[in-house]
Regions:
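Conserved Class I S-adenosyl-L-methionine
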Residues: 73-138
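Short alpha-helix
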Residues: 52-74
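Residues that cap or flank secondary-structure elements
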Residues: 4, 51-52
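A short alpha-helix capping/helix-coil boundary motif
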Residues: 7, 38-42, 110-111
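Short, glycine-/aromatic-enriched active-site segment of Class I SAM-dependent methyltransferases
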Residues: 31-51
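Short "lid" loop at the C-terminus of a central beta-strand within the Rossmann-like core
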Residues: 26, 31-36, 76-81
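A short SAM/SAH-binding and catalytic strip from SAM-dependent methyltransferases
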Residues: 1-10
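A short glycine-rich, Lys/Arg-flanked "PGG" loop and its adjoining helix->strand segment in the class I
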Residues: 10-25
């Protein structure tokens, strides 16, 4: 599950648990801090409102434990994979701008495309990680 749909991983766990058979495996996809930003300003430059928006990887695994789950598998994005994920968004914005130059949102999309690559390589690339975690309730 994508945890933002339920206000975070605890909310997503609660929703997903309703559909899980006993002994079933829950998959949670969640960003985490690879390294905690030194300031709130850097966190905001990463595109979040606060350093408290995400946990570190040890903090996230500990939070799953606190919710009563064993982590039985995890697949973490490496930086190259994350780079490709982010860059695909830039290409999508560029193609959208080419196809929709007169759209009301074109100026906003152009402004985002102008800053997104530099912001990513300056701030988010070193700070963000992302993983999918396989969990089984105890």
């Amino acid at each position: 599950g994508a945890t933002w749909i339920a206000g975070g991983f605890a909310g997503a766990e609660e929703l997903l648990a309703q559909s899980l058979k006993p002994g079933g495996i829950m998959l949670i996809g969640e960003p985490y801090w690879r390294q905690l930003p030194a300031t709130e300003e850097i966190a905001q430059a990463c595109g979040v409102s606060s350093t408290s928006d995400f946990l570190t990887l040890p903090g996230l695994v500990g939070a799953f434990d606190d919710l009563g789950y064993d982590v039985v598998e995890m697949v973490l994005a490496d930086q190259e994979g994350w780079d490709r994920y982010e860059a695909a968004k830039w290409l999508t914005m560029r193609r959208w701008l080419e196809a929709n130059p007169d759209d009301d949102f074109a100026a906003d999309v152009r402004a985002e495309l102008n800053i997104a690559p530099k912001r990513y390589v300056t701030y988010a690339r070193e700070c963000f990680g992302w993983g999918v975690f396989a969990l089984i309730a105890r």
